[in-house]
């Protein structure tokens, strides 16, 4: 059965989730995380997208983005393909890294935007990567620390 095409429109708000195959780590080192975030920042500039929230955990990531004039699929293809190529070179491996294709859910601006931003930014706390909200304020791999 063929996959349904993704819903997208210029200016759409998307909650994006990407997971490692069999929940394996897609971020092994800080260099991996830095590479992913640098690539995301480049896509923001090149493709005119806005990132409202992001969180990188060891085996998955969450993004909350508003697309610009380019389709989300074009943005994510460049982000994820470039990331996987470098990840595989760094870690001397081959093959796929992500489980299936990324999940994207179109969201309404109000009232869901604020709630979803909170959900994404609190993910490291719920996962036990940090022990408190105060520690989350210093956690480099979530947008929470960038806006606090």
Q: Which positions does each model-derived feature cover?
A:
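Short catalytic/metal-binding and nucleic-acid-binding patches
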Residues: 1-148
């Amino acid at each position: 059965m063929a996959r349904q095409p993704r819903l997208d429109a210029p200016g759409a708000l998307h909650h994006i989730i990407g997971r490692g195959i069999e929940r394996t780590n897609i971020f092994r080192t800080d260099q991996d995380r830095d590479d992913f975030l640098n690539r995301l920042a480049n896509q923001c500039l090149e493709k005119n997208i806005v990132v409202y929230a992001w969180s990188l955990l060891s085996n998955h990531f969450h993004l909350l983005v508003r697309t610009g004039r380019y389709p989300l699929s074009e943005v994510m293809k460049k982000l994820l393909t470039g990331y996987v190529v470098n990840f595989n070179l760094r870690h001397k491996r081959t093959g796929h890294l992500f489980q299936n294709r990324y999940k994207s859910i179109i969201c309404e601006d109000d009232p869901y935007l604020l709630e979803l931003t909170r959900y994404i930014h609190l993910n490291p706390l719920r996962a036990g990567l940090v022990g408190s909200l105060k520690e989350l304020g210093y956690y480099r791999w979530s947008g929470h620390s960038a806006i606090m």
